[in-house]
Amino acid sequence: MASGSGSSSSTSSSALSGRLPGSRSANPRKARILGLFDAIQDAVGPPKQAAADRRTVEKTWKLMDKVVRLCQNPKLQLKNSPPYILDILPDTYQHLRLILSKYDDNQKLAQLSENEYFKIYIDSLIKKSKRAMRLFKEGKERMYEEQSQERRNLTKLSLIFSHMLAEIKAIFPSGQFQGDNFRITKADAAEFWRKFFGERTIVPWKIFRQCLHEVHQISSGLEAMALKSTIDLTCNDYISVFEFDIFTRLFQPWGSILRNWNFLAVTHPGYMAFLTYDEVKARLQKYSLKPGSYIFRLSCTRLGQWAIGYVTADGNILQTIPHNKPLFQALIDGSREGFYLYPDGRSYNPDLTGLCEPTPHDHIKVTQEQYELYCEMGSTFQLCKICAENDKDVKIEPCGHLMCTSCLTSWQESDGQGCPFCRCEIKGMEPIIVDPFDPRDESRCFSFSDSLCTPMLDFDDDDLREECLIMNRLAALRKMNERQNSPVTSPGSSPLSQRRKTPPEPLQIPHLNLPPVPPRLDLIQKGLARSPCASPTGSPKSSPCMVRKQDKPLPAPPPLLREPPPPPERPPPIPPDSRTCRHLHHADNVPCRDQSTPHEAWCTRDLSGGNPASVCRVTHDGSPKLGVPSSSVLNGRHSRMSTEAGFMRHKHHKRRESPLETLRVYNGLSGNEEYDVPPRLSPPTITIHPIVKCPVLVNSVSDKVRNSAEEDDCEYKIPSSHPVSSRLPLHCHSIKHFPRLCENGQCLSNGTHNGISEIKKLKPPDQGDVIATSTVPIHFPPARTSARENHPHGSSLTRTPSDYDLLVPHPGEESFDISPPSQPPPPPPARTCVTEHVMPTALGSRPNSDVDLFLPHSDPCPEAPLPPARRGPGEVKSNRLSQEYDQLPSCPGKGQEKASNTKGELLLPNQNLIMRPT
């Protein structure tokens, strides 16, 4: 026990001496004696600590109070500059009271008193208080002399008390013990601590030295003693996780930490241990006539950072804290600029360029989910969210937030405290490289691998029997494996490299997962109101262009296995209650269902909607072109090829639907649709006349809204949802056309798919509804208002819209009373006409709507269909929202908006965490 106490006092005295033990000015004989004491202590081990109960803590308070009263003597004339012992000890007292208040009951207090770190801390605090009292007792009048050795020892004790206060606040934040959750700044150093010490908060120096020696070899006992005096900031023969974190930040990087420490702390003449701000100014005062003289020390107010004092050209003495770079890099840069030339006034300035090694940048891989999320906000993951101009290239430690170097430098130069996002203390910075998400490579491989590996396969048996599809998937899997094993890609140990690999070890998880970026509610709300791919600003310049998806050939389209029957000449009359809406078509625009589309006409399709930059359409000549997304009807089947979800049916559930667009149907299928091939039913048919002026009716139930950035300024066709009849004559009207999408000759109209959809009703042109007109001008007399437009709407039909409903009635129609097909009537005369008919009187539950909208004409026309029914107010609003969806203005300047929001966040007043005694 005596030997342990003697060793402790010897170590404390060596730490409080002017230079490091083992340095140039140390006495070799004294070093050998200290080495002998250190060997004895290693053999015996540190003494066991008594339980830190309430009585022991109160005893510590009394000792601290005595030290404060001794330091309040006016003869001392202590300067109120860090470290100011008259502030440090009262703050320590207040924090200990806070800790005891959190452990007030007996059970918690017993747990606190047995806490390993707390016992060692209280014991060390008692020893340091007794040592300060002994200084006053032994120094007597010399304590009042500012240049005496006793006064110098008191200043060093003040530094130790300052380190102990910072440590207890870090281990017991808010009075609660968090030592087992303390985050070490450097990832490699944190891995070392967890590997050897687990969740321990503090370990004896002997154990720490042995474990460190396994990773970084310690050459001699003198080097071990010097290393201990540098790491052990509280001088208690223990190394805490807090002290280890400070040491690794000071002498980074971890891979060469002992070499850096030897160059900077042992052999460098400019290093000063346990020196204060005032002492640096006093030491450099004698070199005021030698500009370029400098010394450096540990910052006592910002532990883990360096403070460099130097003499300027005009003889002033300044002190600075270098940011965003290691100390040796700051000294090299300062030497080149002429600031740091003479360490401690000496002419020899060590060359530190040997410490400069190319530090490998951590690669942060942008995942598909992050890519889609930031695209919805009109941004990219790699873009700095403060300036919205530069890419992120630096990571703040330990919180892990990313930004660009210029924003971080500006923030620190403006006296910003902590991280600009979370206000967490900035303990270090690491350069990083953000690898953007490339839809060409990653998503396609992942989609094929997921489609083969996931147990929830939902492919058609016909598709699985095709060799070409299976071979393409296997080739994509091999390519993905080669890319993951390639040295070009970022290493698996880099942060946020969330690849689809085996889960990382639990020890690496805190450093692999970066915290989320603070949400931008304004951008998220805008992103919900529109699709990222439909907006012209959905893909910024810094994001990978979606057009590149077409560079690589897609797998061959599935062959025609279930071909629907050929269409007859004319559509048979079907009761209107079981009929869906019809559109007008031209033969040169409609691709034949029996015609196979060439391989080049296949185009990728985004999961979240059509992207004008990533989809193609088949024009009148049949050639694929970029532009408005088409329905991609191939062989009577809808194209499901996607670069982001292969042939995976279950991926449809992951799409994000806008709250303003509740009418949207993805790929022509509702959310609960489970089939992929239309049922074999006898569909209504059409007769296509490319030259005839009178367009005929085509059955189409693509009543969904398609997103697009282009609008065709041409005349469109008038949809009709009723069969022809000979009861009313033909009328010709003149209506105003509205620009709207027309894909592959098919006019798109709005519809609902909430399980039960109301029959499409007519809406006046002035309400912004989608009106498709023929390419031939149609003239009508003015329509008069109908008294039946205020009638309640008719019964709705249960139907599920789908792209496969083209020329195919809904499967549910067979369960109702459908009239058998009649003989097709003779073709109508070759002239432009729009027909209508009267509703059957048998359907009393369905009121007639707007039959009087088209006036009788003298020219009779057999079999005229009813016009579409007028929409109700609720449907008018839905369609208006859907139409405005394609015409959303571009997002306002993201840079200004984000900068303003961030600025408003950054200007929060800093809280003063220092508690003063009352």
Curated annotation (Swiss-Prot):
Residue spans of biased composition, Pro residues class: 554-576, 821-830
UniProt free text on domains: The N-terminus is composed of the phosphotyrosine binding (PTB) domain, a short linker region and the RING-type zinc finger. The PTB domain, which is also called TKB (tyrosine kinase binding) domain, is composed of three different subdomains: a four-helix bundle (4H), a calcium-binding EF hand and a divergent SH2 domain.
Region span, Disordered: 1-27, 481-582, 780-831, 857-918
Recorded name of the encoding gene: cblb-a
Pathway assigned to this chain's UniProt record: Protein modification; protein ubiquitination
UniProt: 4-O-phospho-L-tyrosine binding residues: 297
GO molecular function: calcium ion binding; phosphotyrosine residue binding; receptor tyrosine kinase binding; SH3 domain binding; ubiquitin protein ligase activity; zinc ion binding
Residue segments, region EF-hand-like: 179-251
Further details from the record: This protein has one functional calcium-binding site.
Keyword Calcium: yes
Subunit structure, as described in the record: Interacts with several SH3 domain-containing proteins and with poly-ubiquitinated proteins.
SUPFAM superfamilies, alphabetized: EF-hand, N-terminal domain of cbl (N-cbl), RING/U-box, SH2 domain
Segments for region (Linker): 355-383
Organism: Xenopus laevis (African clawed frog)
Pfam families: Cbl_N (PF02262), Cbl_N2 (PF02761), Cbl_N3 (PF02762), zf-C3HC4 (PF00097)
Taxon lineage: Eukaryota, Metazoa, Chordata, Craniata, Vertebrata
Localization in the cell: Cytoplasm
Listed GO biological process terms: cell surface receptor signaling pathway; immune system process; negative regulation of epidermal growth factor receptor signaling pathway; protein ubiquitination; regulation of platelet-derived growth factor receptor-alpha signaling pathway; signal transduction
Biased composition (Polar residues): 483-497, 898-918
SS bond partners: none
GO cellular component labels: cytoplasm; membrane raft; plasma membrane
UniProt protein name: E3 ubiquitin-protein ligase CBL-B-A
Enzyme class at the top of the EC tree: transferase
Region SH2-like, residue ranges: 252-354
